[in-house]
């Protein structure tokens, strides 16, 4: 598993597993809505009234419509690493 994928895969898998409705914003501003049906290294299969294959390089943001649990040890470690890298020590 690539270093940059250690948070992405558990996040998408939890969305898929819990059937969480999502809004996916593309880099060109288009908003897509549906449920993550499947995904791989390059694409997300988004299901609504039809299934759409969305290339990850075209995605800006994935917004879940409700809270959900990403229960994965790797995801927790990846987030902790991200927080450590971006902590400037200024707790205002």
From Swiss-Prot:
GO terms for cellular component: cytosol. GO terms for biological process: regulation of DNA-templated transcription; regulation of RNA stability; regulation of translation, ncRNA-mediated. NCBIfam families: Hfq (TIGR02383), PRK00395.1 (NF001602). It comes from Shewanella halifaxensis (strain HAW-EB4). Homohexamer. InterPro entries: Hfq, LSM_dom_sf, Sm. Gene3D superfamilies: 2.30.30.100. This is RNA-binding protein Hfq. Belongs to the Hfq family. Keywords: RNA-binding, Stress response. The keyword RNA-binding applies. Pfam families: Hfq. One of its GO terms (molecular function) is RNA binding. Residues 9-68 form the Sm domain. HAMAP family: Hfq. SUPFAM superfamilies: Sm-like ribonucleoproteins. RNA chaperone that binds small regulatory RNA (sRNAs) and mRNAs to facilitate mRNA translational regulation in response to envelope stress, environmental stress and changes in metabolite concentrations. Also binds with high specificity to tRNAs.
